[in-house]
């Protein structure tokens, strides 16, 4: 799942 940041996890 994504989050507000430069990278997104699964």
UniProtKB/Swiss-Prot annotation:
Protein's GO biological process: regulation of blood pressure
GO MF annotation terms: peptidase inhibitor activity; toxin activity
Tissue distribution: Expressed by the venom gland.
Keywords: Hypotensive agent, Metalloenzyme inhibitor, Metalloprotease inhibitor, Protease inhibitor, Pyrrolidone carboxylic acid, Secreted, Toxin
GO cellular component labels: extracellular region
Compartments reported by the entry: Secreted
Entry keyword Secreted: yes
Disulfide bonds: none
Modified residues (Pyrrolidone carboxylic acid): 1
Keyword Secreted assigned: yes
Superkingdom of the source species: Eukaryota
Annotated function: This peptide both inhibits the activity of the angiotensin-converting enzyme (ACE) and enhances the action of bradykinin by inhibiting the peptidases that inactivate it. It acts as an indirect hypotensive agent.
Record-stated family: Belongs to the bradykinin-potentiating peptide family.
Protein's UniProt name: Bradykinin-potentiating peptide
Organism taxonomic ancestry: Eukaryota, Metazoa, Chordata, Craniata, Vertebrata
